Amino acid sequence: VFNVFSYLTETHISVYEVEQGTIAVNNVYNGLILRDEKIINSDYSGAVNYYVKEGSKVAYGDLVCSIDENGDVSNMINEASQDGSTIDSENLAEIEKTINDFLYAYDGKNYYQVYSFKDNVNASLSEALSVNALNDISDYVASAENNNTFHKVITDVPGIVTYYTDGFENVTVDNFTAAMFDESNYSKNDLKTNPAIQAGSPEYKLIDSEYWNIIVPVPDATAESLKDDDTIKIRFLKDAKEAYATYSIVGRDGQQYLILSLKSA
């Protein structure tokens, strides 16, 4: 085991364990994750409802959210989505699988997993209830669409949906700065906390590339020890999954950086 990394992602915090060789060196580093993120801005102003949970993959033509200019249909969706009895067997089976998978893989040493699991189940429930609510009032939806006051937001490219902005959307391996590794400077704007949206403002964010990077500042000695190789093994402490990453070492303003390159499965 070579190192343990915590890096900025999601809230931009997660943990990796990086393995190289056979000697364990349990150092912890802060790192920055960079993905190809595109902010999708709204064409309309109104009440917003979301139908895809954070971190879900979407295909071309999938429904992500809806904008209701006068709010009537949105209120009906919100009211109908409070009824848990409307969850169909398919969605219920998916939620049960999520629970069973968590119970099977749960490790008491990583109690933080409970919070992630809770958020995931709540998001799945919210997604299922909102979609069912939308279908249950299809006549009202169709009427509002005909009146051009209700708008479904459909994806035009596949990718992974997220609902926050943080100012890192245009950061690359070529333009990152040392200040970006200071977590005290990090702030995140949660798009789902606002029940209404203005035209031209962000409604969601799409990650449309399977390639991504983690940038980690490392001591000179570490950079020197890695210079003769280009591949490293990573174990995700969150779920114990493992992956291999290629890497390069870059020096900038007197600091050495390990740049990990990964491809999502």
Regions found by a protein language model. Give the residues of each.
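Periplasmic scaffold and linker elements that assemble and bridge Gram-negative envelope complexes
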Residues: I23-A265
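Juxtamembrane extracytosolic/periplasmic "stalk" immediately C-terminal to the first targeting helix
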Residues: I13-I23
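N-terminal export/targeting signal detector
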Residues: V1-T11
